[in-house]
Amino acid sequence: MSINSLQNLRFLVRYYLTEGGLKLPPEDRRELTPETVLEAKELYLSFIAGFNSWLRSQNISPINPVSLTGSSIYAPKDRENKERQNVTYGDIDYLVSFPTEYTTGDLTSRRKQESESVKKYTELLEKYIQIKRPNQLDVEKTLRSNVLMVIIRIPAGGFVQVDTVVTHPPYEEWMKGRYTPQRGVKGYVTGNLYKALGDYFTLTIGTEGVLARYKDKERVSSKVRKDVTIKSVSTNFKNFLMDIAEYMTGGDFTPDPLLLQHPGMDPENVSVSSLALGIAGLAKTLEERGILSSSEMLSKIYESFIVGLEENVGKKVTKDITQSQHDKLMKINQEQSKIVKDIFTGV
């Protein structure tokens, strides 16, 4: 398979799994309450266990189901909270690590090997479903398109879709945090703040940690693909902001107290405010080092953040959401943008 074909496969997998592609018509979908999510989780894990047994029987390394991710990661806590027992989620995402045999430390080459791993295990998954027809699934619906979007049959009636979010061993711990939103807040909010920070420094803060892309010794955006060298800045979710400071200064810096308090985030306690505080600490650190103006950096990041929030709501509107849903999104945007603004202007 050519490099371009592998890149296209990588894009399609991420497109389906980040854009929330749905196979199920509304009348077949179960409402995703905490109880339903946890029932679907057990059925999905049972399906993966069967797949892994089949892989082992052929001397193929098994995949590793890491954890629920996205908003549904809070289902266990929400089920125990009487005030949130009836909350519903937009979808169910499960983080799964596909084995990859790395033959080089070069990140560009490693990404090609990771894409090959995705292709291999996606094809094996499809073959397993066709041959074994696991009883946890609606086989026909699952095989209808991308098999990483698994249609689980709920014994009491109806179906749910579990989206397999693919990662690889070096990024498992990072992805536990990066794909976790703040509880009760849409994931696109934190996603836009990561993006605004990354865009300011021409870095990517995504599925493989914090990456810098170089062409002709200059950092370039992810839109530039040809003749690009990739450098890993951080895969440590608890320390990635400190790692960015080290990268930007070449290691010659004294962390601001705010950055010491918020060097990254706790995957178990992700919040917009914690990320904003860490970004503010990073700005103060780099200003003290004489690299940039803290106020200018925070102002530009905030402007990009706001544009991203507005674009997200605009995309939702084109999907015919109700006025009530639109108003709810606008309220979330207003509340979270105020939190970020207050932090950025208060340091």
Regions found by a protein language model. Name each.
Residues 3-16, 340, 344:
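Short linear clamp-binding motif
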Residues 140-346:
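Catalytic cores of NTP-dependent nucleotidyl/adenyl transfer enzymes across multiple folds
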